[in-house]
Amino acid sequence: MELLRLLAVAAVAAMAAEVAAGGDSGWSSGSATFYGGSDASGTMGGACGYGNLYSAGYGTSTAALSTALFNNGQSCGACFEVRCGGGGSCLAGTVAVTATNLCPPNYALAGDAGGWCNPPRPHFDMAEPAFTRIAQARAGVVPVQYRRVACAKQGGIRFTITGHSYFNLVLVTNVGGAGDVTAVSVKGSRSGWQAMSHNWGANWQNGANLDGQPLSFRVTASDGRTVTSDNVAPSGWSFGQTFSGGQF
């Protein structure tokens, strides 16, 4: 009985500590700036290859990640919850952003004096509308806390096929769940599953001739979950088209 009482006391103490901390587990420290203008029009394109972020479904809640976070494009599509880490310019609350770009290092400047994206600094260069939800724009740069969160997306994963015969380049966008993709496979009606290799950003490539075949795609996210989208592209697909599949 005494052991049960002690365990109960310990459990209550742990819950009290959790409440006192606001349930704040999993946060890391970094910094944030902003770019792209008040309408985020300057954030279009970028190192993930998403192009027009409005039509691609990412909107203005986006961020360019420093090299330490970008992971050579493997972090494209990952979602982060960010909050201001202190100072008079901070605003209450958090904002969720999707990684859509790289914030390149500037080795001509010190990491704490303009070289915000220099390794090994974890930094978010956020679209201005996202930044101004957690801090006043006049701050320029603020310390932040961040953590990975699930991505909430509408509709299915999108596959945009470009390239040419024997070089299929597929841009994978609108990925829910973990958001960032670690593996993609493609299957034609006359072939088995073939692994695609990471090309750049959110683009994956394959060297098979898949012309004239219905195409299926299998996407694996960083959390290990996999979604298979069967026959999303009909046999008459052509390069430049986008097709929607399943979702996490």
UniProtKB/Swiss-Prot annotation:
One BP annotation, GO: plant-type cell wall loosening
Localization in the cell: Secreted, Cell wall; Membrane
Membrane topology: Peripheral membrane protein
Disulfide bonds listed in the record: none
Signal peptide limits: 1-22
Tissue specificity of this protein: Expressed in roots.
InterPro entries: Expan_Lol_pI, Expansin, Expansin/allergen_DPBB_dom, Expansin_CBD, Expansin_CBD_sf, RlpA-like_DPBB, RlpA-like_sf
Domain of life (superkingdom): Eukaryota
UniProt cross-references to Pfam families, sorted A to Z: DPBB_1, Expansin_C
Chief location of this protein within or outside the cell: secreted
Keywords: Cell wall, Cell wall biogenesis/degradation, Membrane, Secreted, Signal
Domain Expansin-like EG45: 45-156
Alphabetical list of SMART domains matching this protein: DPBB_1
Record domain Expansin-like CBD: where: 166-245
GO cellular component, one term: extracellular region
Function in brief: May cause loosening and extension of plant cell walls by disrupting non-covalent bonding between cellulose microfibrils and matrix glucans. No enzymatic activity has been found. May be required for rapid internodal elongation in deepwater rice during submergence.
Family recorded in the similarity comment: Belongs to the expansin family. Expansin A subfamily.
Protein name, entry field: Expansin-A11
